[in-house]
Each structure stands twice: as structure tokens, then as C-alpha cells.
């Protein structure tokens, strides 16, 4: 057992280094945050030499946030405390990372900034030290396409005074920058890329303002698009038609470049939330869908980006069958596939002729 994994069971027993209070932290960010908007985050997402195009690139991504309806269906309070990760989600993250690394791969994590308010962040440092990148998922899990204050996040709708006098664009930009500064302050390194809370059917197309915001915040690539696909009737087993529709949607989940030069590495259907909340599937149906999606990508030397959440997987897949399945499929493919992070995928698409 790792030292940080053991410490999670001690309810923040390590008092040697006091975490800054919320007031102290935001005061620090207010002084440092301007550097992000003025180019201080240029090193956040570097796109250098591309990987070869003769193999499928398979990514396993875990969003570090709590999700409504998990572990119990009546759990909805997480909407207001997305980053208050419980011990089970942290342990799941560490063990999933250990398993994937043992197979020669990495997991790309995305954390909401609220996570860095927790007293013990050693487990996040351990993930990074073991080669697993951690990206920015905004501070409060905000809706980056919002144009009205009440649409930004549940928390701000209930407490509008927190954003009074600011435009939605200002709130969203600040929320992104706060997550970056929180990571730098608590972990000592900058985020590896950016993922939007929620996936958008058309990504950031039609929103050049948001694309430019991402570039201004120092991100050369983002993960925003999540293509449309069928779910079937909630609670019913996945039918062939539903699974065929999910496979068909993989073509719409391939990475691309916006006119602004921003790269998007989409999330591949179906996500764990889509499977266990929307479709109310059993684990075996989710495994079938993931197998078909990964096999589609391997056959075409394409990209598959598994979108999951430790807070959703630990009650639904306690034996890590999903990550083990992906690792096994890539191993069976030999030199036709590799498990990589999203930066590696972004490098390949950025280098492709357009």
C-alpha cells in the first residue's frame, strides 16, 4: 500500500503542513491570476513532435469530481460540492492508476479546483510522480458555454452574490484560472490540458470566443466534444441497435482542430455516467460498449478516449474490469495500439496536414 493511500484512511491525520484557508488561497490567486491571462500559462499544454500515425491511440481518462446519484441514487448534494472527493474515489483513482501503469500505460486525470481545498493532496502528487498527468476541469465544474449567470453552475444559481457584477465570460475565465493556480499552489505543477465539465455535441464550434479564452488561458488543446448517440430505454439491457449506434458515433469522436488553432480531443461514447445514470445499465453492458469502441479504434488506427469518473466506477465496477478490459485489448493489439495521454493524441492531430 502506498503511503498516500494509507493516509486517506486517517481522515486527514497529517497536520504537518497546514493547507491555506479558502480566504488565504483566493487572496493568493487574485495576485497571481493575472499572469495566466497575460501569458503566464503558455507552458500549460505544449504540443511538440507528433507520434506515428500507424497505431491506434487509446486514452483512459478519469475526471476527479463527485457525481450526483452515486454511490446512492438519492445523492444529489454533490452538485454543490463537486470537489469534495470521498476516500473511496481517491483509493479507486490510485489503484486504477497502478493497474494501468503495470500494463505500460497512463491515466489522464482531470481535477476540479475544489479538490485542492482538501487538506491531503499527497495522493495527487503521487499520481503525477508515477507519470499520470492531471488536467484542469475548472474550479467549480462550470458550464463554459453559459451566457446567463444562472446557467454557470448550481452553486452560483443558489448563491448569486458570489458572482455579482461579473459577466458569465468573466466568471468562467476566472474559474479556469483559479483551478490552474490552485494546482500550482497545492501540487507544484501546472495542469496538463483542459476538459470541459460536460461534453458538447458540437464541441466549441460556433463559439470562437470560448476557443480564444482557452488559448488565452494557455491551453493548446482541450477535451470538449461528446458526440450524440443512442442510450435506449433506462433500465433495459443494451440492444444491438443501441450498441451499433454507439460504435457509429466513434467516427464523430475523433480529434480535430478548430479554425482558431485550438485542438479538441473528444470524449468517446459511452461514458460511465451515460451508462449507469442515463441508461441505467448493468456493468456487462458497459463493458460490451467499451469493447466495441476500442476494437473499432484499433481496427482503424483511430482514437478512443474513455471518459469515466472514480466516483461512478467504484460503486459500479469495484473490481476494475473496465480499465483491465481496455488494457487487455491494447495488449492483444500488439504494435497496432498504445495507451497514451491526451497530449500525445493532440500532438498527432496538430501535426496532421490540413
Q: Across the structure, where does each feature detected by a protein language model lie?
A:
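N-terminal secretory signal peptides and thylakoid transit peptides that target proteins
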Residues: 8-33
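N-terminal twin-arginine translocation
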Residues: 18-24, 35-50
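Active-site beta->alpha N-cap acidic-glycine motif
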Residues: 51-133, 142, 190-191, 195-199, ...
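Acidic-and-aromatic substrate-binding clefts and catalytic sites of carbohydrate-active enzymes
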Residues: 85-90, 110-121, 142-147, 169-172, ...
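CE4/NodB-like, metal-dependent polysaccharide N-deacetylase domain
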Residues: 93-106, 157-201, 219, 257, ...
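Substrate-binding cleft of extracellular glycoside hydrolase catalytic domains
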Residues: 130-176
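Active-site-adjacent pocket scaffolds in enzyme catalytic domains
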Residues: 153-161, 196-297
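C-terminal domain-boundary segment and adjacent tail
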Residues: 221-226, 283-354
Amino acid at each position: 500500500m502506498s503511503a498516500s493511500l494509507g493516509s486517506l484512511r486517517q481522515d486527514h491525520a497529517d497536520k504537518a503542513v497546514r493547507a491555506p484557508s479558502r480566504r488565504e488561497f483566493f487572496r493568493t490567486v487574485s495576485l497571481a491570476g493575472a499572469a495566466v491571462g497575460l501569458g503566464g500559462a503558455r507552458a500549460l499544454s505544449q504540443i511538440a513532435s507528433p507520434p506515428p500515425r500507424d497505431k491506434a491511440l487509446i486514452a483512459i481518462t478519469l475526471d476527479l469530481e463527485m457525481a450526483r446519484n452515486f454511490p446512492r441514487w438519492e445523492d444529489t448534494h454533490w452538485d454543490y460540492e463537486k470537489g469534495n472527493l470521498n476516500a473511496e474515489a481517491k483509493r479507486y483513482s490510485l489503484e486504477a492508476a497502478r493497474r494501468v501503469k503495470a500494463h505500460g500505460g497512463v491515466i489522464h486525470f482531470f481535477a476540479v479546483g475544489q479538490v485542492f481545498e482538501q487538506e491531503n493532496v499527497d495522493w495527487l502528487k503521487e499520481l503525477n510522480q508515477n507519470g499520470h498527468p492531471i488536467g484542469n476541469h475548472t474550479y467549480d465544474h462550470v458550464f463554459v458555454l453559459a451566457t446567463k449567470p444562472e446557467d454557470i453552475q448550481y452553486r452560483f444559481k443558489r448563491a448569486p452574490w458570489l458572482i455579482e457584477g461579473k459577466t458569465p465570460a468573466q466568471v468562467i475565465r476566472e474559474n479556469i484560472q483559479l483551478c490552474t493556480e490552485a494546482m500550482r499552489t497545492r501540487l507544484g505543477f501546472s495542469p496538463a490540458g483542459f476538459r470541459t465539465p460536460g461534453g458538447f455535441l458540437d464541441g466549441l464550434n460556433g463559439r470562437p470566443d470560448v476557443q480564444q479564452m482557452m488559448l488565452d488561458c494557455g491551453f493548446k488543446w482541450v477535451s470538449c466534444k461528446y458526440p450524440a448517440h443512442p442510450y435506449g430505454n433506462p433500465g433495459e439491457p443494451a440492444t444491438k441497435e443501441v450498441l451499433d449506434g454507439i460504435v457509429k458515433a466513434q467516427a464523430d469522436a475523433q480529434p480535430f482542430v478548430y479554425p482558431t488553432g485550438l485542438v479538441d480531443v473528444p470524449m468517446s461514447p459511452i461514458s460511465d455516467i451515460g451508462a449507469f445514470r442515463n441508461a441505467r445499465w448493468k456493468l456487462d453492458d458497459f463493458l460490451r460498449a467499451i469493447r466495441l469502441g476500442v476494437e473499432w479504434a484499433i481496427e482503424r488506427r483511430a482514437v478512443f478516449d474513455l471518459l469515466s469518473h472514480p466516483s461512478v466506477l467504484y460503486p459500479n465496477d469495484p473490481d476494475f474490469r473496465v480499465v483491465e478490459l481496455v488494457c487487455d485489448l491494447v495488449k492483444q493489439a500488439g504494435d497496432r495500439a498504445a495507451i497514451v495521454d491526451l497530449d500525445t493524441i493532440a500532438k498527432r492531430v496538430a501535426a496532421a496536414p490540413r
